[in-house]
Amino acid sequence: MAWSLRAWRRARALRRGRLDDALWRRALGRFSFARELDAGDAARLREWVTLFLHDKTLSAAGGLDLTDTMRVEIALQACILILELDIDSYDGWSEVIVYPEGFLVDQTWTDEAGIVHQGKVGRIGEAWLRGPVVLSWADAGAGMEGAESNVVIHEFAHKLDMLNGPADGFPPLHKGMNRAEWNQVFRGAFGDFRLRVRSGLGTRIDPYAAESPAEFFAVLSEVFFMAPQVALAIYPAVYRQLKLFYRQDPAARLALPVH
């Protein structure tokens, strides 16, 4: 009965919230990872985007004029992560707040000498446990052609990571996935990446990934969708784990060799 009620509610939301065809085609055309989808995947993504916009409140802040085009483009980027999962993956919270540009937040941190500092720091995105996602449109709208980073994918990867508690780079894995293997692969890659960054070695992956296991997972999720060839070349074992987790293979969509 509960399943039937949920299916009915979804069907009603899809009917009432049908996206404008021209708007949807434009949104698909702006993102390389969306243009690569076949017709069936694109149709499913459209359903998730429609349900996302039905379920979540997208609120403007800082004087931003949040248009329908912007809403759809944010939702599309958020929903590519759950294309082969379910919209329920984003249950438990209700709002996306969008600023025109980067924003300031209060933060307390401890430096390497053990001294505690307090102050305001700049952000282009944040994800709160059981709370909103906060985005800078200047950056959310930049994750398009040729980009290898994507703040929307980054923050929504954190949201998936938070399904089993505070973000720690260890989201709830699907049945059949090996927790020990995930841990071994990600710990090894994270340690290697931190060493690269601290040694001043060049890398195409954002150095911010060295901040913590949670940030490593979120940044590698960006690369997985935006530049799968980079993830394959640098951390193929991580790519394989993300392929299992997201149940997608972006490299195959590009006809790239998979190791």
Regions found by a protein language model. Give the residues of each.
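Acidic, metal/ion-handling microdomains and their immediate structural contexts
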Residues: 32-52
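Metalloprotease/metallohydrolase-associated module, dominated by Zn2+-dependent proteases
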Residues: 14, 23, 29-32, 52-53, ...
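Short, charged early-sequence alpha-helical segments and their helix-coil boundaries
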Residues: 59-71
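Charged, compositionally biased N-terminal leader segments and the immediate start
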Residues: 1-22
